[in-house]
């Protein structure tokens, strides 16, 4: 399955081109001919991955708002989750996903598509989504304050990840959106000012702190973010 291609792991891959090539290997060499490639059609990189899968002799199940296999027709926010209206083949399904955020809906659709491609019925796959528990540290609700404010923890450590989380929480905010974040040391330095700008644009209050500086001077990392 393919979800997205964003600026991440460049400390390992070096460039986005190399990172993209590594993801394409899923369909070039690992998924065999005749199997189903489940692809997020809402990703900008979808055309390239779809072309690779077709060239490798695989069947495509595209998912998402633009999906032709498993389509997201509607998404309604709930206090701690979302109600999804999905279409698969000729039927529509209402699914209550107990996870917040548009990106969680994308994750869920790819997961459901993989289950269906693996032999489960749509009903079985969607029933599983309704009882799913989020991964620890992935938009995890960890508490609430006496005045109604809620606290979430997320692993976001890239510009895209931070932007995705802040946009996911924004519809639920009744007062101020406050973000506390940092950047790891000895990793991709180019993402630091990007994350700072995203926090400034999308949150009312941004608090920059230290996040595993490793061999770097913490103050220098904070300065690059700011």
For the regions a language model picked out, list residue spans one by one.
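Histidine-centered active-site/metal-ligand motif
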Residues: 9, 13, 157, 189
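Conserved phosphate/oxyanion-binding catalytic-loop motifs
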Residues: 154
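Acidic, Mg2+-coordinating active-site environments of NTP-dependent enzymes
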Residues: 1-151, 226
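Active-site beta-alpha connecting loops in nucleotide-dependent enzymes
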Residues: 135-137, 160-226
């Amino acid at each position: 399955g393919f979800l997205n291609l964003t600026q991440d792991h460049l400390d390992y891959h070096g460039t986005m081109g190399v990172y993209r090539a590594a993801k394409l290997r899923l369909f070039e060499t690992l998924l065999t001919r005749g199997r189903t490639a489940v692809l997020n059609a809402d990703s900008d990189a979808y055309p390239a991955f779809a072309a690779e899968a077709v060239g490798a002799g695989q069947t495509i199940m595209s998912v998402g708002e633009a999906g032709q296999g498993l389509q997201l027709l509607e998404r309604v926010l709930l206090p701690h989750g979302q109600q999804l209206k999905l279409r698969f083949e000729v039927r529509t399904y209402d699914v209550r996903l107990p996870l917040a955020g548009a990106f969680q809906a994308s994750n869920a659709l790819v997961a459901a598509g993989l289950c269906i491609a693996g032999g489960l019925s749509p009903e079985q796959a969607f029933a599983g989504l309704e009882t799913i528990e989020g991964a620890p540290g992935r938009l995890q609700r960890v508490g609430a304050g006496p005045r109604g404010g809620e606290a979430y923890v997320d692993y976001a450590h890239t510009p895209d990840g931070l932007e995705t989380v802040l946009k996911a929480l924004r519809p639920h905010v009744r007062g101020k959106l406050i973000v506390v974040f940092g950047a790891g040391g000895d990793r991709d330095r180019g993402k630091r000012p990007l994350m700072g700008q995203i926090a400034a644009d999308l949150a009312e209050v941004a608090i920059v702190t230290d996040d595993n500086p490793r061999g770097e001077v913490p103050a220098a990392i904070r300065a690059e973010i700011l």
